[in-house]
Regions:
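The feature captures the conserved acid-bearing segment of alpha/beta-hydrolase catalytic domains
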Residues: 28-30, 149-255
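Short hydrophobic segments within beta-strands
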Residues: 39-40, 125, 162, 194
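Active-site signature of alpha/beta-hydrolase-fold catalytic machinery across serine-
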Residues: 52, 136-140
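Intrinsically disordered, low-complexity domain-flanking/linker segments in eukaryotic proteins
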Residues: 6, 144-152
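Serine-hydrolase catalytic machinery in alpha/beta-hydrolase-like enzymes
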Residues: 3-123
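Active-site catalytic pocket residues across diverse enzymes, especially alpha/beta-hydrolases
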Residues: 57, 141-145, 218
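Gly/Ala-rich beta-loop-alpha elbow adjacent to hydrolase catalytic centers
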Residues: 126-130, 134
Length: 257
């Protein structure tokens, strides 16, 4: 099942500019619906292609929502337009951050989750830039607000990031530690990060650095997995890790090994 969304994002964007998100593909649960996870693609990719990987996972109790990012000029590509959750000059936490687009995309993702049933647990995952977006959403959840100060509306139960990085890492610790509630939410949110040691697109050291930034800011429920000889792509071992990790974190009944 897929559909397009073209609407104005107001809750996460300073200027409430109109962003045209592309096709969203939904992978329906094959068993009892216990969890919904929004899965976010990498730079230049799309939601339907992500869904092909997720459909084969032995997780029958999860509904996967796979949106497509807006097409925008990307500084890293010399201004060439492609699908991107936000503009980026380099694929690391050392680069400058496109806060307006980060907030707008985070609001779009939260909106996709906001209509799920109350008894369904909610999560966000992604690959590369999608992982960066998932981690930014995790920080918004912990802080209780987007970067622009508007309230973050969704109660997240799990975050998965493959081959990604953490936007806003430099200021995260001080923000989380300034609020008891933010610290409590950060400490209780399970996060799984996986990164290939041979990744030459988002370097492994940036994955390590992001994990350290998160844990030092109070995200203590974090697991970091490294993979020898693996570059900037997913492998079956990572997907197996996701299945084994998500099952107890979300209390899933129907995991098939």
């Amino acid at each position: 099942m897929s559909y397009n969304t073209h609407h104005n994002i107001g809750s996460g964007s300073r200027t409430a500019r109109t962003l045209e998100f592309g096709r969203t593909h939904v992978v329906r649960p094959k068993g009892k619906h216990q969890a919904t996870i929004v899965w976010l693609h990498g730079l230049g990719d799309n939601g339907p292609s992500s869904s092909q990987l997720l459909e084969s996972l032995p997780l029958p109790n999860i509904k996967w929502i796979c949106p497509t990012a807006p097409t925008r000029p990307v500084t890293l590509l010399g201004g060439f337009p492609c699908t991107a959750w936000f503009d980026v000059g380099e694929l690391s936490e050392d680069g400058s951050n496109d806060w307006e687009a980060l907030d707008a995309s985070a609001a779009h993702i939260a909106n996709l989750l906001s209509t799920e049933p109350a008894d369904v647990k909610l999560g966000i995952g992604g690959f590369s830039m999608g992982a960066a977006m998932a981690l930014y959403s995790a920080t918004c959840y912990a802080l209780g607000r987007y970067g622009n100060g508007n309230p973050y509306p969704v109660n997240l139960k799990a975050i998965v990031g493959l081959s990604g990085w953490l936007p806003g890492a430099r200021s995260l610790k001080s923000k989380v530690q300034s609020s008891h509630e933010a610290g409590r939410r950060a400490a209780s949110l399970p996060i799984l990060l996986c990164h290939g040691i041979s990744d030459d697109v988002v370097l492994y050291k940036y994955g390590e650095k992001s994990a350290h930034s998160l844990t030092s800011a109070g995200f203590r429920y974090l697991t970091f997995k490294s993979y020898d000889g693996i570059g900037h792509y997913t492998v079956p071992a990572e997907m197996d890790e996701i299945c084994h990790w998500l099952t107890p974190k979300l209390g899933l009944e129907g995991y098939r090994s």
